[in-house]
């Protein structure tokens, strides 16, 4: 029988000399409950947790294969966790009265996003021990976490008369933890109108070859919060090592970025005018649009 040793080339096959592991777990769940109410109302609750966890380890024992060797055992382990929760409460209304059609939505949503990272490493582990906490030399650990939340009030009203004249109005009020309290909330309205000319009585003779002729126009304000977390305040970074002048290291901390408490929602004003046309049982379709977009802040 040949036994691998730390100086034998066969030793590289020994899992006690080098070991790397990677484990990842993900779970995405979409839960909902819906209740129909009188008079055309309906209530719906959506709950969507999105969870992930990752753990990686890397271990090297002492070995010597000539040109390739490792004099001190070492190990590194890191863990990463991400949780994203979204809860929505939606109340809708949908009714038709003769030629009048009305639908409406009122909702509230809350989203929480949290991530956490942990890293630990060290050298000089006792023989047969693969726990980074047992390291006797150059022990180091680092950890950070960040969290953000978004709350939204959503409303929308749609009205149509005889499928000829259409209007939709929406309003959102969003609050983001990425901004300071005085700039936390943004207000984003929009309105759009449409005219189905092909449904007018004076277009009756054209229906044999024209299926659709619709004019539409819209104006709205969109909000954008896609920035890094905590930009409105000063973030301290720790676990920074400095030489002590005697061959050792001193742990310290320093401000990572300059605070900007004036940062706020980016707003984009959009204006759109368009036309939709369809001919010969929709064999030929034409769509034209004119846009104007203005972004500020």
Annotate each language-model stretch with its function:
Residues 2-60, 70-297:
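Extracellular/periplasmic, surface-exposed regions of secreted and cell-surface proteins
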């Amino acid at each position: 029988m040949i036994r691998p040793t730390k100086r034998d080339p066969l030793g590289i096959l020994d899992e006690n000399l080098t070991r790397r592991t990677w484990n990842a777990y993900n779970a995405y769940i979409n839960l909902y409950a819906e209740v129909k109410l009188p008079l055309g109302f309906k209530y719906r609750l959506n709950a969507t947790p999105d969870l992930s966890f990752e753990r990686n380890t890397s271990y090297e024992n002492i070995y010597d294969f000539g040109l390739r060797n490792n004099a001190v055992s070492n190990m590194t382990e890191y863990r990463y966790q991400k949780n994203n929760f979204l809860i929505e409460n939606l109340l809708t209304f949908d009714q038709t009265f003769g030629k009048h059609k009305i639908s409406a939505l009122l909702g509230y949503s809350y989203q929480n996003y949290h991530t956490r990272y942990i890293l630990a490493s060290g050298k000089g582990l006792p023989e047969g021990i693969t726990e980074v906490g047992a390291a006797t030399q150059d022990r180091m650990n680092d950890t950070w976490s960040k969290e953000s939340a978004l709350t939204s009030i959503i409303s929308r009203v749609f009205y149509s008369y005889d499928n000829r004249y259409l209007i939709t109005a929406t309003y959102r009020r969003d609050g983001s933890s990425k901004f300071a309290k005085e700039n936390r909330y943004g207000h984003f309205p929009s309105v759009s109108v449409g005219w189905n000319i092909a449904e007018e009585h004076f277009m009756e003779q054209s229906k044999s070859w024209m299926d659709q002729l619709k004019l539409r126009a819209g104006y709205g304000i969109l909000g954008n919060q896609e920035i890094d977390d905590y930009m409105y305040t000063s973030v301290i970074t720790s676990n920074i090592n400095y030489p002590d002048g005697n061959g050792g290291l001193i742990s310290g901390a320093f401000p990572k970025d300059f605070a900007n408490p004036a940062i706020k929602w980016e707003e984009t004003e959009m204006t759109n005018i368009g036309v939709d046309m369809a001919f010969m049982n929709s064999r030929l379709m034409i769509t034209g649009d004119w846009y104007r977009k203005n972004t500020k802040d």
